[in-house]
Amino acid sequence: MAKRLCAILGASGIVSQRLQQRLANHPWFELVAICGGPDTAGKPLSSIGWKLEQQRPTLAEITVLDLSNSKICKQLLELGVSIVFSAIPSEIAQDVEPMLAESGFAVFSNASAYRRVDGIPLVIAEINP
């Protein structure tokens, strides 16, 4: 089975870094892009400070894409991304996540922005594995 190409929204936060750990060497997913804000966009992922106690995972060298770029959907599509894991704040997620979903990406979000919206499932591992 070919791995599904995925991206993470958010580059420097703890949730993003936990996602990076979980996606490194995953049997189903290949992390090919990380999108960040003005403080991280354009930087190599390896240059961004690591906050977790566990060691930084070994990932391909990724340059952080600018999440505010109006062509972010096109950039992700060109990379072959079909799945996006979002670790961005709710106030940013409200604008970015619907745009990505409308462009055909499957979006899995940690943000609270859409937790109570009909038609958007809430995934809780202990309840719906």
Go through each PLM region and give its residues:
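N-terminal Rossmann-like NAD(P) cofactor-binding subdomain of oxidoreductases
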Residues: M1-P129
